[in-house]
Amino acid sequence: MAFDGIVTKSITKELKNIIGYKIDKVYEPDKNTVTLGLYGKSSNLMLLICISSNNCRISLTSHPQKNPSTAPNFCMLLRKYLIGLKIKNIYTIDLERIVFIDLENNENPNKPICRKLIIELMGKHSNIILTDSNNIIIDSMRHTSTLENSNRDIYPTARYIFPESTKYSFLELNTFDDFYNAIEPKLIEYIAENSLNIENLNVSNFMIDKMISNTFNGISLSFVQNILSKLNINEISKNNFELIYNKINEILSSSFLDIFLVENQKDYYLYTSNIENESQFNLNYKIDDFYFEKETSELFKNYRNSILHLILATLKKYEKRLENIDNKLSECNNMDTFRLYGELITSNLYRIPNRNVNSIEVENYYDNNSPITIPLDRKYLPLYNAKRYFKKYNKLKNALAIVNVQKDETIRDIDYIESVIYELDNAKSIDDLGAIYDEISENGLFSDKLKVKSSSKKASNKKAKPMTKNKLTSFNPLKYVIDGYTVLVGRNNKENDYLTCKFANKNDIWFHTKDIHGSHVILKTNPNEIVPDDVLFEVAKLAAKHTKAKNSSHIPVDFCKVSFVKKPSGSKPGYVIYSNNKTLYV
């Protein structure tokens, strides 16, 4: 559900427990997020405020944020005005998605300091605003002006004005009749406009969720939809409206609220609980966990799509290059014909008029003197036509060797690009994507496409540390144990290189699917040890699992001692050659 007024009020109710805490740290991880370090009651807490249009919220957080090395201007201003202040009060008004944090410092009784931090959680209009005791804005994360089609001025020295609302306040309703009287006019209007029968209204032809959401302040569409589902309401009646009213009241007045995750944790709903929560910040941390997973998933998806777009554009370029090379090779297949034309023209010069001839038919003495028609350019003399055919022949003959080399190189390049796509398909975390981005950034194949920005400044700002044999910081292959034997699996091309060429011992056994993109797999062994056949087969199955053909059957897997695996100088990441191998089919 949306972070609506009901969630805002419920979160703020828990945050009453941070009254008396002092602000001792202020960070701004990104342009939409501020975190406040709080100290009090012998504990440290971190309050997260996010004004991203899709994920705006306020809650305590247990997830560390990566902060820029240089604090942004707004962060510096908040540090100046907030650090050392104590939280005097935290509250909301009605069901508005606005949280007010009153701050004070009474260390100097003659000069008390009072400030207010206002968090407006209103989608794309969200903001973080700092005011003084007279409601004069000191600064805000986003500035707006009535000159820019805004209904309020939000900038330094302007007076803070509470946003207007044309909706009813649910909290000011005293009875169900007040609730129904607010909805009834819209109900009648909707029935008249759509020529509906009041006796035959149901959820399918009447948008009750939208009507309630549009009538009452702070109640989101998804919140009402969940209530309709929980109460199993299909028909529109006054009794059902009363059930909805009572359910909203129950949630708002509940002392213990929890969240219910649905659809593989893609959404959540509030529900009342009879069990007292172990933590006084239960709702805060559960909603924080939900949004952390949601943002991480979105970040992963966006970052992956950016890299995939870059790789596919490069793949398309090299596939086009291969197509052009094949066209050139097809042209080279005709080069002997051009030589034949030149020879036959030369030997028949006495039979060809000097000019104005489009073609000539002569006997082909290479083919039992069978007749052959040779095209001519009528602008030129016959001898010059022959020279042109010899020139074409020599040009294609010289090109043939070069084009064959280019074709081999291009096929290897395409093979490497496809191996990177395989890596991307198997990436599980932002760190995995960061390693792939680092790999392609260092490769000349992608140089003209590398204008894409890393979606994850949080991930990409983290420079990959060099892989070392003793310091396994970046080098973190997948690890398995089969019948007591350790098996290591590379996660990307660079890690495959390091695993096989530097980390593995010469007596270890190397596995890789034959002619199929996949991970390098190393079976750790002792010198002169004979590995049982069933272990070799299980490791081969593991190698097949970590491959592009993992869903196929009868997959060929080559294996040999690491000492027989070599990496050619200048070859692409992940590319090796090997010998003395055996093959298992799994």
Functional labels for PLM-detected ranges:
Residues 1-520, 524-586:
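Extended, highly charged segments
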